[in-house]
Amino acid sequence: GTVTLPASKSISNRVLIVNALADSELPIENLADCDDTQSMVRILCSENSYFDVGHAGTAMRFLTAYLSRIIGKWVLTGSERMKQRPIRVLVEALNRLGARIGYLENEGFPPLEIYGSRLVGGSIDIPASVSSQYISALLMIAPYMEKGLEIRLTGKVVSSSYIDMTLQIMREFGAEVGREDTVIGVKPGEYRSVPYRVESDWSAASYFYELLAIAGEGEIILTGLKEKSMQGDSRQTVVWRKLGVRTCYEGDLVRLSAAKPEIDRLDYD
């Protein structure tokens, strides 16, 4: 049978921010239907100055950076649980780059009071162990900083594939970016408006690979996946081939078919 997979949440959230910075009226097709994405859509379309993201952690991080360069005074809050999630690393980084962000309740936690302004940018050191969403939040607004941005990641990088995803989306919207291992550079400029269709979620595809591997026969067609995907989970095809599931790309469709496993046991890190 044919399965319509959900859209990638990670790509949807990044494209929403970049598209808003581009001030684009062109459509974004196939957005993810999840709390984070829907919160961001609602807030980005709002004319209010007080925003509540609820439980949406990605929205809190990405919108903190986004609002810091939108002229005006903004309040960004969330659920009681969200108010217990630290955001100091991102806020301090933004303030060093020229933002004006303060805490309305507990130091280092939402809710935040944000005075949107023109950001100077420059060079900044960030611990590589922090959430990749902090790094992505900084990168996405970097073209609009007067000096651009250079991020030097200190220590062992985690979630590198999500940083690369952010950079790829930025390139697709016209940003000049570069990365050499732990140093990421973004030149000052602007995003251009482009129509965009979000690819399907490779992590959701894993369940159907598993079904075929267990069944040992049959085939399944999955929609909306790309062979040259920016999602790190797309590399799972190598693992599933060893476990007896072949992957064949046909345009924006992926045909999975059961085959003889190449191994009896898999140890994979």
Language-model-detected regions and their locations in the chain:
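Short, structured segments at the rim of ligand-binding sites
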Residues: 1-269
